[in-house]
Amino acid sequence: REGRKRQGKMMDEKTIKKIVERVVNEKLGDKLYPGQTVETDEGFTKVKDPSGILKIAQSTVRCEPFEQQGVALKDVTTLEEAPNMGCGIMELNHTSFEWTLTYDEYDIVLDGTLEIEIDGRIVKAGPGEIIFIPKNSHIHFQTPDFTRYVYVTYPADWQ
């Protein structure tokens, strides 16, 4: 059956979504203005303003496995929302992986230690620190423990 019973009435999926979005909004302590929407469809909380401004609650982003054990990521903007720059969250867990960037990338460390190895040298960053990696760099992303960071790419379509 579609929906859930509440005091003898059926609640459809749209009503349930509105209730969930209202609860999430209250939990985040935000006031929505006319035209703003809260979306949770992508598995995390995103506030959209009609101007195109977005706010992503990074703590709600759940990364998905990517290419090898110990590497997970989640893009948090779509090409429709941000056609020029990409953004997402990446997590590394006691791992290293080799990558050649065909784009420019900023990495903003949220938790743990991120190490970028290039030509035998290591650039290390901790929470609150930012690393810039220029296009065409052949590197190893690595961490001695666990790290979670925001990546921002230009151009947006990094894959």
Q: Where on the chain are the PLM-derived regions?
A:
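Eukaryotic intrinsically disordered, low-complexity regions enriched in proline/serine/threonine/glycine
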Residues: 11-25
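A short, N-terminal "cap"/entry segment at the start of jelly-roll beta-barrel domains
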Residues: 21-86
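Ligand-binding loop in jelly-roll beta-barrel domains
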Residues: 135-158
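Short acidic-glycine-tyrosine-enriched beta hairpin
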Residues: 119-135
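Short, conserved beta-strand element in jelly-roll/cupin
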Residues: 91-92, 100-116
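Conserved short histidine dyad/triad with adjacent acidic residue
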Residues: 71-101, 135, 157-158
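Short, Lys/Arg-enriched N-terminal segments with co-localized hydrophobic residues
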Residues: 1-10
